[in-house]
Amino acid sequence: MAATPESKVKKRIKEILTKFGAYYAMPIGTSFGNSGVPDFLCCVKGRFLAIEAKAGKGKTTALQDKHLCSIHTAGGMAVIVNEDTLDSLEKLLASI
């Protein structure tokens, strides 16, 4: 099976998180789960970081936006990453 554009972004995010020694989990969405939860839930040097992966010009859903906003409100960091912003993720992790 060929890798989807989003799966390629997720693969690169995993590589970056590993490079920085981050803990991460990737919740699996199911009909019984909590829809809209970000693709990656991470702990980087004691800081909570959620990452929503998108490919190309993919947009977040209203439910994903709600989760990202709730994470910010609770004091965590939440970012959306695509192919063009992988370098920004590395810079963010380096700054923590």
Where are these regions (language model features)?
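Catalytic phosphate/metal-binding cores of nucleic-acid and nucleotide-processing enzymes, i.e., regions
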Residues: 1-96
